[in-house]
């Protein structure tokens, strides 16, 4: 994300408080995944040079999209992820990430809406709060998402 993002919480604006006046912002968040910081980098063990396609989302100061498939909250400005997957004949996507109850949930639901089979690796996810995680898991299950506890289950 941008260091100048309008959604970053501060002493006057607590995290998770509403923002108005910007169509692609809804609530404030602590600064995270800022370009040029460790939080923006791939985790150890994932070599970005081995990937054919990377999505950079939320780098604009006035946007904080949750899903990886669109740059906006209305799901109209594509990141190209859906098109890339379709072009390469991919029909199943395995997901994980941060945060289960926001970005992961929205990405998974965007992929399901686009017609993909989606598997959520629960061990590869972390969320914000138990209540919102539970709600997100229910919403994803209702959409037909499959769940595995860990990657080993995928090999079985």
Which residue stretches match the model-derived regions?
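Structural recognition of alpha->loop->beta junctions
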Residues: 28-30, 41-53, 131-156
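Histidine-anchored nucleotide/phosphate-binding helix
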Residues: 104-113
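Active-site alpha/beta core segments
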Residues: 1-92
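A short glycine-rich beta-strand->turn/loop micro-motif centered on a GG-aromatic cluster
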Residues: 94-97, 116-130
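Gly/Ser/Thr-rich loops at beta-strand to alpha-helix junctions
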Residues: 99-103
């Amino acid at each position: 994300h941008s260091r100048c993002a309008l959604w970053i919480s501060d002493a006057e604006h607590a995290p998770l408080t509403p923002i108005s006046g910007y169509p692609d912002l809804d609530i404030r968040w602590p600064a995270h995944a800022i370009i040029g910081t460790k939080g923006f980098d791939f985790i150890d063990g994932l070599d970005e040079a081995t990937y054919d396609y990377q999505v950079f989302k939320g780098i604009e100061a006035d946007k904080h999209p949750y899903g990886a498939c669109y740059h906006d909250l209305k799901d109209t400005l594509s990141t190209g992820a859906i098109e890339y997957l379709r072009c390469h004949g991919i029909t199943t996507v395995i997901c994980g990430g941060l945060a289960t109850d926001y970005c992961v949930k929205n990405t998974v639901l965007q992929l399901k809406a686009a017609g993909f089979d989606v598997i959520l690796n629960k061990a590869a996810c972390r969320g914000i709060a138990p209540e919102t995680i539970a709600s997100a898991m229910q919403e994803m299950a209702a959409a037909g998402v499959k769940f595995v506890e860990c990657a080993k289950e995928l090999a079985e």
